């Protein structure tokens, strides 16, 4: 059996709005005790549903012209990024070549230093031999001329 009950006061109305969390309602609500449900009758300013999600409709539309402009701007941005990446790739290749040339120059310098080191070693040995020869000559001169 259904009984019709008006909103008795503003507090009851606001409690019903809090339960539904959407819109405003003016009118009657009907309590169905058999089904444990509530039905409404009256004026609805917004969509009113209990325990059901309200699906909002997106009212933002994009025209084809705006979509094409967006695609064009994206294409331009991507083209700009591609050219920047290509330029950076060329710079990286040039830097790699420079590093390889410098590596070769360093290897050549190391070979030259090694050769110079061996040459200095040989000169040092020659100087030792000259010193030994001079020492022997000095010893002979001392034997010949003992006047000192």
From Swiss-Prot:
Pfam families linked to this entry: DUF16 (PF01519)
InterPro entries cross-referenced by the UniProt entry: DUF16
Transmembrane segments: none
Superkingdom: Bacteria
Family to which the UniProt record says this protein belongs: Belongs to the UPF0134 family.
Protein name (Swiss-Prot/TrEMBL): UPF0134 protein MPN_204
Biological classification of the source: Bacteria, Bacillati, Mycoplasmatota, Mycoplasmoidales, Mycoplasmoidaceae
């Amino acid at each position: 059996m259904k009984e019709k009950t008006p909103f008795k006061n503003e507090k009851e109305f606001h409690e019903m709005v809090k339960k539904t969390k959407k819109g405003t309602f003016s009118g009657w609500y009907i309590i169905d005790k058999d089904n444990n449900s509530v039905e409404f009758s009256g004026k609805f300013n917004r969509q009113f549903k209990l325990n059901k999600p309200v699906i909002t409709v997106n009212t933002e539309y994009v025209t084809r012209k705006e979509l094409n402009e967006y695609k064009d701007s994206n294409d331009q941005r991507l083209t700009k990024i591609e050219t920047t990446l290509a330029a950076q790739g060329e710079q990286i290749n040039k830097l790699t070549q420079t590093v390889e040339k410098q590596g070769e120059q360093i290897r050549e310098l190391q070979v030259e230093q090694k050769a110079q080191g061996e040459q200095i070693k040989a000169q040092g040995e020659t100087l030792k031999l000259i010193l030994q020869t001079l020492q022997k000559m000095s010893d002979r001169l001392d034997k010949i001329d003992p006047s000192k």
